[in-house]
UniProtKB/Swiss-Prot annotation:
Gene3D superfamilies: Tubby Protein, Chain A (3.20.90.10). It comes from Drosophila ananassae. It comes from the Eukaryota. This is Protein king tubby. Belongs to the TUB family. GO terms for biological process: protein localization to cilium. PROSITE patterns: TUB_1, TUB_2. GO terms for cellular component: ciliary membrane; cytoplasm; nucleus; rhabdomere. The lineage of its organism: Eukaryota, Metazoa, Ecdysozoa, Arthropoda, Hexapoda. Signal peptide: none annotated. The modification Phosphoserine is found at S142. Its main location: cytoplasm. Residues 154-166 have a biased composition (Low complexity). It is found in: Cytoplasm; Nucleus; Cell projection, Cilium membrane; Cell projection, Rhabdomere. It is a peripheral membrane protein.
Length: 449
């Protein structure tokens, strides 16, 4: 593959990652080169597709290299009478369009791995515009017995980029947002504090977060080595001041398993079930639409049976609707002293979380949903306000809320670079539950996209 083809492929991947099926951060800005220009000499895009990102702004026939100064800018032409000779011929554009179509037919291993240019932050826009532009995707309720496309195919290409802040109001619950501030100002003066590790790591990761405390974490994906392209290792760290971090958990996918099965441990050097730091596991059904989180209990034991920590259900998409994933998370309920209700599907005397949810027995369980993203007509994409914690568009980006209070964000997860993701959580989740929910987002789902 030549230099031109490689550049066109990179531009195509950047466009594909910004497709309407992905969720972008709403607190970033997109430049509008055609706004405010109503004269005869206004600038128009010469290309309506990936070519506009790699063409020179001075010479439309020149292709910029990766190291060219000026960054990524759309090629433009001047429509004034004095500059009519600068118009590109229709045949040249058609030839380049054919070349783009030929290159785009090749699939890459991970179409979300190429970087996305981040635009600097600017002031917020009116929240009324966001309200009028909402376009949620229909929710499908079946989750277990249908086959569809895999995790990385059949996504439309659309010209979109990170957008400016949407002016999302703060949460009425404790007057707090996920940036730890009140009223959404981001000044850190709210009543919510940032959490720190208390006691031993193995005990801390299983304890529910105290009310009024926010834990800001980071997940890194290690794909180096012989087989880590298919079986990467994920590391969870608690972020601290001045770039410091504290290791909490590590997770990896088991190789010899009929379904997706992740081992989670607080020992980064030994990610096995027999390790002293083994904390639990995440197991999916055969379609990858339903995941169950277990602790490190013994399935056969009657004294300390294995407990259910969470169930994650992804809605199937057999009709091929374009839009973000829809997910439901079911957690054990909380007691008056802020401890989890013990539920075990391994105990024959009681029902598991999934069985209780199917029977609509909600007495001892809590149901969460991903927050519905807002459709932005300007960028032709779905956006959410991550308060600066997420910088790249991805189908994996999500926020979890309860239907009774959609402004209280229990957990949020999103991409910041190719193999780095932020994960923030608060009451009633613990680190183990939040990390397992994030791991389920990484796993391929043959019936969800």
């Amino acid at each position: 593959m030549g230099r031109l083809e490689r550049q066109l492929m990179e531009a195509y991947i950047r466009q594909k990652r910004a497709s309407p099926g992905m969720v972008q951060a709403s607190d970033l800005q997109i430049n509008r080169p055609m706004s405010g220009m109503r004269s005869n000499s206004r600038e128009l895009h010469a290309y309506d597709g990936p070519m506009q990102f790699i063409s020179s702004p001075q010479n439309p026939d020149q292709i910029l290299s990766n190291g060219s100064p000026g960054g990524i800018a759309p090629a433009t032409i001047n429509t004034s009478r004095n500059h009519s000779n600068n118009m590109r011929s229709l045949s040249t554009i058609n030839q380049e369009a054919d070349l783009i179509e030929e290159i785009s037919s090749h699939e890459l291993e991970d179409e979300e791995s190429s970087p996305v240019t981040v635009i600097e932050q600017h002031s917020a826009v009116h929240s009324a515009n966001s309200t009028q532009s909402q376009r949620p995707r229909p929710r499908q309720h079946s989750f277990s017995d249908t086959l569809d496309e895999d995790d990385y195919t059949n996504r439309n290409v659309a010209a979109a980029a990170p957008v400016r802040p949407a002016g999302v109001p703060s949460s009425p619950y404790k007057e707090a947002t996920l940036d730890g501030s009140s009223n959404g100002t981001g000044n850190g003066t709210g009543g919510e504090s940032e959490g720190d590790v208390i006691g031993n790591i193995d005990q801390f990761v299983m304890q529910p977060a105290p009310q009024g405390v926010l834990y800001k974490c980071r997940i890194t994906r290690d794909r180096k080595g012989m087989d880590r392209g298919l079986f990467p290792i994920y590391y969870l760290h608690l972020e601290r001041d001045y770039g410091k971090k504290i290791f909490l958990l590590g997770g990896r996918k088991r190789k010899k398993s009929k379904t997706s099965n992740y081992i989670v441990s607080c020992d980064p050097t030994d990610l096995s079930r027999n390790a002293d730091g083994f904390c639990g596991k995440l197991r999916s059904n055969v379609f990858g639409t339903s995941f169950t989180v277990f602790d490190n209990g013994n399935k056969e034991s009657t004294e300390s049976p294995r407990l259910d920590l969470a169930v994650i259900i992804y809605d199937t998409n057999i009709l091929g609707f374009k839009g973000p994933r829809n997910m439901t998370v079911i957690l054990p309920g909380m007691t008056e002293d802020d401890q989890r209700v013990k539920i075990s599907s391994a105990d024959p005397k009681q029902q598991g979380i999934l069985d209780l949810w199917k029977m609509k027995n909600m007495d001892n369980i809590v149901e969460l949903h991903n927050k519905t993203p807002v459709w932005n007509d300007e960028t032709q994409s779905y956006v959410l306000n991550f308060h600066g914690r997420v910088t790249q568009a991805s189908v994996k980006n999500f926020q979890l809320v309860h239907d009774s209070d959609p402004e209280y964000i229990v957990m949020q997860f999103g991409r910041t670079s190719e193999d780095v993701f932020t994960m923030d959580y608060r009451y009633p989740l613990c680190a183990m539950q939040a990390f397992a929910i994030a791991l389920s987002s990484f796993d391929g789902k043959i019936a969800c996209e």
